[in-house]
């Protein structure tokens, strides 16, 4: 594992002060992905049996405050997390001017597959069960990757995602999938309903009342984080 910086500390799990603090270690890592090298933040929680890969949406990165919030919730539930950039800095610069990469779902999915294969070779993560958490276009990429390597992926969660962009991969997904959409995100609700109806695996559509696409309303992101945590713990967690 290539690490540039490392932090360690303790976090309190759900349930209050009566439970022991969980030890965690976070490393900045570099992930080979074909000709590209991707930067990521890997957090390992003591005793974790599963890891969740975060697949950000268009115009975002591993520094997404929403994904970081959800990741901390998963860490408190005893899950390891990997937040990583889908593009190199050079690619981000190109995409900022052309927008030609952010909707290339196959490229995003392949980057996720590369990251998964990398994690399977690292001592800290090779024995952990795997889940994907995708946002916006990242939701589609997560489903395409899950369909490509079904033996490796145990659960998928999509937040405000565009699963419709996964196209022909949808009926091939085997991992239990949770689709989370804001109640006021009408168009995306319809797209998620259509995608759900094409899937053959265990799939659930969860609507967060009063929430818009980015879940910026009070309590909305907390609800997303708890739904995701429950789904991953049930399907790949302890």
Outline where the language-model segments fall.
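Catalytic histidine neighborhood in serine/cysteine hydrolases
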Residues: 199-214
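A conserved short beta-strand
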Residues: 151-163
């Amino acid at each position: 594992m290539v690490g540039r910086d490392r932090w360690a500390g303790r976090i309190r799990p759900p349930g209050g002060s009566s439970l022991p603090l969980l030890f965690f270690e976070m490393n900045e890592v570099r992930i080979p992905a074909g000709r590209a090298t991707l930067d990521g933040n890997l957090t390992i929680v003591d005793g974790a049996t599963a890891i969740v890969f975060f697949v950000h949406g268009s115009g975002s990165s591993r520094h997404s405050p929403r994904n970081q919030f959800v990741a901390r919730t998963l860490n408190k539930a005893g899950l390891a997390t990997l937040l990583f950039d889908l593009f190199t800095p050079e690619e981000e610069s190109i995409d900022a001017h052309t927008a030609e990469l952010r909707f290339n779902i196959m490229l995003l999915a392949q980057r996720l597959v590369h990251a998964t294969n990398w994690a399977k070779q690292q001592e800290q993560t090779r024995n952990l069960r795997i889940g994907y958490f995708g946002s916006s276009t990242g939701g589609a990429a997560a489903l395409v990757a899950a369909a490509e390597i079904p033996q490796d992926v145990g659960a998928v969660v999509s937040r405000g995602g565009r699963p419709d962009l996964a196209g022909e991969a949808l009926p091939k997904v085997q991992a239990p999938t949770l689709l989370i959409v804001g109640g006021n995100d009408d168009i995306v609700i319809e797209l998620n309903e259509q995608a759900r109806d094409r899937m053959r695996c265990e799939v659930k559509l969860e609507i967060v009342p009063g929430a818009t696409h980015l879940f910026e309303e009070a309590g909305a992101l907390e609800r997303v984080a708890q739904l995701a945590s429950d789904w991953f713990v049930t399907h790949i967690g302890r």
